[in-house]
Amino acid sequence: MKFLLRASSLAGQSLRFASQRPKVFFDVSIGEEPAGRVTMELFNDVVPKTAENFRALCTGEKGVGEQGVALHFKGSKFHRIIPEFMIQGGDFTRHNGTGGESIYGNKFKDENFDLKHTGPGCLSMANAGPNTNGSQFFICTVDTPWLDGGHVVFGQVTDGMSVVKKIEKMGSRSGAPAKTVTIADCGELKSE
């Protein structure tokens, strides 16, 4: 049975595996100033491979990748920020939107498109076309249904949308940030 689920409603839904979904965090700085924490729930019950890639990149537990760089979001930047659209990060190899690497090697295939881009806080994979997922991701700041079927949704911001909005304010139409926005720290939150 194929699930057609709304990502924004999944965060609060009580599904069978909801209690087993990993939660991860980013502690973000804008310029040199701490901006706050963003907490995200990963939908490993719908897209397990994609969710695991992101979770492991938050913890850094996989060590160094094929490109000789730590597989870890810590210290990486939000390199593309477009107000009323999304904030994009995850390029820890080149730091400009042209790099990145998954825990499975350079790129991996689109897992499925069951989850939809239904609103602010939706966490999705950035790519360069079909089956080119690496480490780059974006967080939507508005409803973006035109991305459905082209980008794999794998999570939802559960806390810290005010921080996402602060990041969004650093953006421009071209996507170039007004200030450097850095993932100062990141990891997994253990369930209690």
UniProtKB/Swiss-Prot annotation:
Disulfide bonds: none annotated. Its EC number is 5.2.1.8. This is Peptidyl-prolyl cis-trans isomerase 1. Pfam families: Pro_isomerase. Residues 25-188 form the PPIase cyclophilin-type domain. It catalyses: [protein]-peptidylproline (omega=180) = [protein]-peptidylproline (omega=0). One of its GO terms (biological process) is protein folding. PPIases accelerate the folding of proteins. It catalyzes the cis-trans isomerization of proline imidic peptide bonds in oligopeptides. GO terms for cellular component: catalytic step 2 spliceosome; cytoplasm; intracellular membrane-bounded organelle; mitochondrion. InterPro entries: Cyclophilin-like_dom_sf, Cyclophilin-type_PPIase, Cyclophilin-type_PPIase_CS, Cyclophilin-type_PPIase_dom. Belongs to the cyclophilin-type PPIase family. PANTHER family: PEPTIDYL-PROLYL CIS-TRANS ISOMERASE (PTHR11071), PEPTIDYL-PROLYL CIS-TRANS ISOMERASE D-RELATED (PTHR11071:SF561). Keywords: Isomerase, Rotamase. SUPFAM superfamilies: Cyclophilin-like. GO terms for molecular function: cyclosporin A binding; peptidyl-prolyl cis-trans isomerase activity.
